Amino acid sequence: MKLFLDSAIIKDIDKRLDSGVISGVTTNPTLIKKSGRVPDDVYADLIQDIGVQDVSIEVDGKYADTLIENGIKYGKLWVDQATIKLPCTPEGIKACKMLNFMGIRTNMTLVFSVSQAILCALAGATYVSPFVGRLDDNGHDGIGLIREIAKVFCHNRTETKILAASIRDAA
């Protein structure tokens, strides 16, 4: 099991890394905008200054070619630390497949079903990020979805890991 921090506030992340239980950091454009900083500066601080070993970097783009181009940029710049965060859309899944082929780690976000998680795993995703809180907010069982995905992944010996996202509380 791993715990990832969802933030772009460097001093908060640095403080929490001292606990020794944080395995990585996930970011997104909204969090970076709230930080008031330029995305590349945030990523450089996370990786180079405070030494985060696994940073999910959400790339811009609507179509696979743009997602791939942006994924390559960060995937090659920080080979050992960058995990490229892509949307679970047909274009995102195409990009995932290509980036996986190139040896670049991926985190598929906006996963809301077992079927989506399976497609991401088949494309070679390193992580799938089911949105637990959003599912719960809409009357669905987010943790139940995690259980179902885990069952399918375990049964099929899938290497893709599940990274629960959008968790609203620790209960």
What are these regions (language model features)?
Residues K2-D14, S19-V21, T27-M98, V132:
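Active-site beta->alpha loop and helix N-cap motifs at the rims of alpha/beta catalytic domains
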Residues D6, L86, T109-L110, A165:
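Short His-Asn-centered micro-motif
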Residues V25, I32, L110-V111, A165:
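Long, contiguous hydrophobic alpha-helical segments, chiefly transmembrane helices and signal peptides
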Residues P90-C96, R105-N107, V114-A171:
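Catalytic alpha/beta core domains of metabolic enzymes, predominantly
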